[in-house]
Amino acid sequence: MNRRPSSICIPVLIAVAMLLPSCSPSRFDRIVVGSKNFTESFLLGEIMAQMIGARTSLKVDRRFYLAGTYICQQAILAGRIDVYPEYTGTALTAILKQDASAEKEDVYKRVKNEYERRFGLTLGPGFGFNDTFAMEIRGEDARRLNIKTLSQATAFAPQWRAGFGYEFMERPDGYRGLAATYGLHFQEQPRIMDLGLLARALKDHRIDLAGGNTTDGLIPALDLFVLADDRHYFPPYEAVPVIRRQTLEQHPEIAQILADLGGKISDEEMQNLNYAVEGQHRDATEVVHEFLRSKGLVR
């Protein structure tokens, strides 16, 4: 499976197309599931798509790899997609522009209420895992330097090269705030890289610190070490489905489907799903189907 487009032109063209007025006939009999442009979001989108396809008579269209957070938000507001997976901390800071909170329940409640009020969007129950940003270094470096936290890493950062995804460099809860909180200064300006390339670039010594995610399946596989966010900079990033209120009104049965997915995926299970696709290069559709069957959610 192609994990993500290799050229920036593809997501840009998709993004433009997503925001154009629709010329298609009414899609009352179908649901459009979207995702962001990284493996975990794709997998969550595929999980919802397979569940809806298995439990309803609706046709399910997949519009995956829609660049980042802002494009997905615009797409769902424009009615070009009906549902996609989001993260509560991202919604709170990047979309709602609100200050972060360390309490998972508080973040969920604030996002749920504001999304309903401002956008007519409904948050379903959380999938069960929290995928926060992970500042990763090589395991060998963590052991050699005896460092476990971001605060400890600041002493070594001036000799390191860092790499981050584009969105992390631009977001209010991203690099600038992290650097200010910890006083981070690197050997050179951080490199902006595709999320799927960061872990291997770190392992191959092309960078020395990577901004990844805690459920990245390559962390244990490549012997990477996640530095503890000891100053609690990052808010909770609980994975949740976001769906249009109008879609739920037209297809109320989807609410039960999303409820059945609530709490079904642990941090470890999500990491294993990611690794099956990114590390073992397995077909994502098959990986998702096997997982749903193991949970008794589909036949």
Q: Where in the sequence are the language-model features?
A:
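C-terminal motif of bacterial Sec signal peptides marking the signal peptidase cleavage site
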Residues: 20-22
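Short, well-ordered beta-strand elements
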Residues: 28-40, 58-64, 158-163
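Ligand-binding cleft/hinge of the Venus flytrap
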Residues: 48-56, 150-188, 290-297
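Short helix-initiation/N-cap motifs at beta->coil->alpha
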Residues: 59-74, 188-200
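Alpha-to-beta junction loops
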Residues: 77-86, 158-160, 177, 202-212
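Ligand-binding "clamshell"
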Residues: 95-124, 204-206, 218-232
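A conserved helix-loop-strand patch within extracytoplasmic ligand-binding domains
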Residues: 106-161, 245, 263-267
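An extracytoplasmic/periplasmic, membrane-proximal ligand-sensing/linker region
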Residues: 169, 173-184, 252-299
